[in-house]
Amino acid sequence: ELPQALGTGVDVSEGALCVAKENRKRLGLEQRAELIQSDLFSADYFQKNSGNISLEYDMLISNPPYIPTEDIGKLMEEVRFHDPVLALDGREDGLYFYRRITEQAGKYLKPGGWLMYEIGCEQGADVSAIMQGEGFTEVTVKKDLAGLDRVVIGKKQMQEEQHV
């Protein structure tokens, strides 16, 4: 639908990247989708290019691990045994990765760019507060088809808004 769009996929899991590479090939996106193994923004790719204007994205979309550590044992077996713990464990309160990503996202978003998260159904207010605390505006929680909070969206301030 967006034939000029370019993307960079980042995951810490080698297995997840293998699946992403298969999907990229199947969809014919090899020239438009770059895939990087990294723990968030720690890869050399981001460190070497952190001042590079070409690394300013229009949007960052993340589905980070968001289940509190103590709740992982309570998950349905289909989830608990299908997904690796690495993909589920959001640490103590389930918000660890939202904090880490949000505090760094501004360095990689263009002014007016969007940060979007998938969230646990009870995390909308907390993730919204994290984003607002880092200066994101127009923060909105979107519901899924079941009527549960599922996505939080926020906008990086425009340059002139940041200096007011």
Q: Where are the regions a protein language model picked out?
A:
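Flexible, glycine-/basic-rich loop-and-beta segments that form/coincide
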Residues: 158-164
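Mobile active-site "lid"/loop adjacent to the S-adenosyl-L-methionine
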Residues: 66-96
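Conserved Class I SAM-dependent methyltransferase catalytic core
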Residues: 92-156
